[in-house]
A protein has these predicted regions:
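Residue-level recognition of conserved beta-strand positions in structured domain cores
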Residues: 73, 137-138
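N-terminal targeting leader peptides, primarily classical Sec-type signal peptides for secretion
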Residues: 4, 8-10, 101-106
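Signature of long, low-cysteine stretches enriched in small and polar/charged residues
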Residues: 87-131
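Solvent-exposed loop/turn segments at secondary-structure junctions
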Residues: 68, 76-79, 115-116, 141-144
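Short, solvent-exposed secondary-structure boundary motifs
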Residues: 39-55, 84-90, 112-118
């Protein structure tokens, strides 16, 4: 009888030692991965010492008598929404050139607009690393564009991510 009781107690203890499988259910709250921090933007701006800088939640706006330069970081995913934010136009209304290097997509575009002080030309670039849109825009008067073209080419060619 003692053997049977001892065997029964051992069986009772051993049944509680088995590993239980955990199953995911619809009601489970899964941890969403945290979005990585935005990368640092590198760009060479002309004449930085005389510019007025306005801080926005998304980036900086550099103001000069001849031009405005915007450097912003926006959420990635919807390029149309980013273009609408930057220049007020949808992708279908613009000619957007797309290239890629080092896992980063690069979108370049230009636009023209009537401003308060006459016609304006705008040029923009968006770098998309899959998490964020890193944006550079320049808007300047349409008059007298020949002498500043080299300067703007240097600004856009220097735009990169660290």
């Amino acid at each position: 009888m003692k053997k049977c009781v001892l065997l029964g107690v051992l069986l009772l203890f051993l049944t509680g030692c088995g590993s239980q499988e955990t199953f995911e259910t619809v009601a489970d709250v899964l941890d969403a991965p945290a979005a990585p921090q935005p990368r640092q933007i590198l760009v060479d701006l002309p004449g930085e010492e005389g510019q007025e800088v306005l801080e926005t939640p998304a980036g900086q706006l550099y103001l000069s008598e001849d031009y405005e330069i915007g450097v912003e970081v926006l959420s990635s995913g919807d390029l149309d929404a980013t273009l609408k934010t930057l220049c007020g136009r949808k992708r279908e209304e613009l000619t957007v050139m797309e290239t890629a290097a080092d896992g980063v997509k690069r979108y370049e575009f230009v636009w023209a607009a009537a401003g308060e002080n006459g016609d304006q030309l705008g040029r923009g670039m968006v770098l998309d690393d899959g998490n964020y849109h890193y944006c550079l825009t320049v808007q300047r008067p349409a008059e007298g564009t020949g002498d500043t073209q080299i300067v703007w080419s240097q600004v856009f060619s220097s735009f990169s991510l660290a």
